[in-house]
Amino acid sequence: MPSLRDLRRRIKSIKSTQQITKAMKAVSAAKMRKAQEAVLSARPYSKRLKSVLGRVAVASGGVSHPLLAVREPKKVAYIVITADRGLCGGFNSNVIRRATQEMREQSAELSLITVGRKSRDFFRRRGYNIAQQYVGLGEEIKYGTAKEIASFVIEKYSAGEYDVVYLVYSQFVNILVQKPVVVKLLPAEPPEEEGEARKVEYIFEPSAAAVLTELLPKYIENAIYQGLLESKAGEHSARMTAMDNATKNASDMIDRLTLSMNRARQAQITKEISEIVGGAAALE
């Protein structure tokens, strides 16, 4: 059985750790609220952009465009978005696991564009071909980052170096749930208009084909930007939940160790009393 000194030392150490997890939970909660507001406010724009792209694609009458070109998937690229840091439960490992599962099913030549240190370090250690990496993006997601990533993959796709490009990230569902998803970025697949929306005729200037040419790169940029926002909100939510669980587990450990310490102290006192009584009896 541990001594009283050891038990006190362990309790003190756990209390110190608990203070850290409490502070990290509070910080993550504040960052999560900000990231959640950003992702929720961006979703309507993303949805409307897809809708507009679908209308323009229909109006353009099947015009050919490099970003719409479908080729045999001999070279496939994956953009994998994770966090730079850990201490967020299974957030990073779930995204990486989903990406590796998808890649195992591919017989094509693979290339990776990693966003976040966790994905970069994981795939680098395992010898994957990392064509581009982005780390240290900070807490505030900038549209320029998404534009830079989009420009890289669009250039590679247009040059025929990639035949298909996928985006893998963790979709923010709610504070407790983050769902890893895989989205095909290229070739771009404009959604089809349904119902009454198909019957509406639009006038495009200078032409639907010209609008489509301008819209497609922005569609790719926005999809990546939305993925970055979703991932950031999910990261902070997962970290807040992980730190909350760690704080609760620390409280449980402190309670158990305190009980053990009280029992040890009681046993020590009982032993001392027995020794005193025994000594007194010996003197009689």
UniProtKB/Swiss-Prot annotation:
Gene3D superfamilies: 3.40.1380.10, ATP synthase, gamma subunit, helix hairpin domain (1.10.287.80). Its main location: membrane. This is ATP synthase gamma chain. It is a peripheral membrane protein. The gene is atpG. F-type ATPases have 2 components, CF(1) - the catalytic core - and CF(0) - the membrane proton channel. CF(1) has five subunits: alpha(3), beta(3), gamma(1), delta(1), epsilon(1). CF(0) has three main subunits: a, b and c. InterPro entries: ATP_synth_F1_ATPase_gsu (IPR035968), ATP_synth_F1_gsu (IPR000131), ATP_synth_F1_gsu_CS (IPR023632). Produces ATP from ADP in the presence of a proton gradient across the membrane. The gamma chain is believed to be important in regulating ATPase activity and the flow of protons through the CF(0) complex. GO terms for molecular function: ATP binding; proton-transporting ATP synthase activity, rotational mechanism. GO terms for cellular component: plasma membrane; proton-transporting ATP synthase complex. NCBIfam families: ATPsyn_F1gamma.
